[in-house]
Amino acid sequence: MYKYILKRLILLIPVMLGVTLLVFAIMYLTPGDPAQLILGESAPKAAVEALREKMGLNDSFFIQYLRFVKNAIMGDFGRSYTTGREVFAEIFARFPNTVVLAVLGVIISIAIGIPVGIISATRQYSLMDSFSMVLALLGVSMPVFWLGLMLILAFSVKLGLLPSGGFDGLSSVIPPAITLGVGSAAIVTRMTRSSMLEVIRQDYIRTARAKGVAEKVVINKHALKNALIPIITVVGLQFGGLLGGAVLTESVYSWPGVGRLMVEAIRQKDTPTVLASVVFLALVYSVVNLLVDLLYAFVDPRIKSQYK
């Protein structure tokens, strides 16, 4: 088990190098001068050039990237061009808000997706099955930003029940959490149905039914337990994705999370903040995936033998 964890952690190194190189190249090629943005449009050219030299922006691409990697290894990701604060201080201040959205989104997706998926599987080809699959297809296909705008229009503009954005107590969490949860619930529903259908066709399920075991026991104890592995995979990936990719939702609702911080940094060509955000979110996503893989061993002990 420990060797497996060590291997996964070592594999993170080339992944992080590739991710940071790609993002660094994109920011390098993006039009705009960070020094000019910091000093303002009216700043003298001499002052801008002096700041560029001080920031090392006149160096070649690879020199700048290697300097970033060296500093990152030492734990120094620099300071934000716009606020002057250490970038990880900015990220840690906003990350709890992103976690709140991700956790609520996953709770909504599990609360809706697993029960609906089980019902669809046990009533295959019924009206309920067809209706739930149509809704799941709509949920998967629906753009996040469109759903977010429709919820704002309905509950904030028309009904006035919920705030349209920002962070102002529990009521402000509900719309973005629903926006995230709907898409994830659709994916969890489809995976639960598919996994349950595969399991309930197995011989041991037929045997349990032939012995007169109650249908609820067959479904909830025997079938669902063995169908959990792919469901856990999807839920884990959804949680990691919500932690690292709730950018659109946070932007639509002006939610003060890491995703919105990264969008603001991209607009302002705040390279240190963008790079630190990408590194942080990539690490979070990778760690969540590792934890999901390790969770398999507790659901199915047979998998423990593979973690060597």
Give the label of every model feature segment.
Residues 15-66, 156-175:
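Hydrophobic alpha-helical transmembrane segments of membrane transport/permease proteins
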Residues 53-61, 77-87, 165, 188, ...:
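Membrane-interfacial helix-loop-helix junctions in multi-pass membrane proteins
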Residues 2-3, 89-128, 167-308:
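Alpha-helical transmembrane segments of integral membrane proteins
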Residues 30, 139-142, 243:
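Transmembrane helix irregularities
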Residues 58-114:
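An internal, D/E-rich "acidic patch" concept
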Residues 84, 133-194:
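Membrane-water interface segments at transmembrane-helix boundaries in multipass membrane proteins
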Residues 6-16:
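N-terminal signal-anchor/signal peptide hydrophobic helix marking the start
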